[in-house]
Amino acid sequence: GENDLKTSLEIAKRVTAAGFGVLLNFHYSDFWADPGKQIKPKTWADYGVKELEQAVYDYTLESMQTFLDAGVNITMVQVGNELSNGLLWPEGKVPNYDNIATFVNAGIRAVRKADATIPVMIHLDNGGNNALYREWFDNFTKRGEDFEIIGLSYYPFWHGSLQMLNDNMNDIAERYGKDLVIAEVSMGYTMEDYK
């Protein structure tokens, strides 16, 4: 199925009715966005940086307002998904941290306009890679709006040992003073190939 606004709203209303909170995750893409692909929505394909900034703001604010008006219990918003290599490529691809911050800041400002009490998470992959987190957040925090939570993905097959994850989490919690969330995780029973 699709996770367009209509479908996502129906799911979020059911989740709220069941007594749960909703983490609203903006991918800013027509398809799943991750470190290997951060493709701009087709309708934004020809936009420059300023137009992309405005589109992120408008889409985020309109979506937030739609969810809030429907009574959805949004308990956290994630601006972008696994942003290790940026978002809205090619304009927002690492190492262009100025544009990355421009786009993420637009999303954060829109969340704050809709409801300033909802915490914002910025999420990277590769939770065991401390150098990645330091480079990314050192660059973003020089240019970025304030946010509350750093999200990490942790898949041990790709992202290192639990000790590496632990060391990274301890370092970035102290370095940036943010709460941490493991936003994606999968722990296999075995690392052996199926025979």
Cite the ranges covered by each PLM segment.
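A short helix->loop->beta-strand "cap" motif at the edges of active sites that frequently abuts
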Residues: 18-20, 116-118, 176-179
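Active-site cleft segment of glycoside hydrolase catalytic domains centered on the general acid/base Glu
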Residues: 5-6, 34-141, 145-147, 159-169, ...
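Anion (oxyanion) recognition and catalysis
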Residues: 16, 112, 174
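Glycine-rich, aromatic-flanked loop segments that form ligand/cofactor-binding clefts
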Residues: 15-33
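Short glycine-enriched loops at secondary-structure junctions
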Residues: 26-32, 80-82, 186
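N-terminal carbohydrate-binding/catalytic regions of secreted carbohydrate-active enzymes
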Residues: 1-17, 21
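Hydrophobic faces of well-ordered beta-strands that scaffold small-molecule active sites
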Residues: 22-26, 75-79, 120-122, 148-152, ...
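Substrate-binding cleft of secreted/luminal carbohydrate-active enzymes
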Residues: 154-157, 179-195
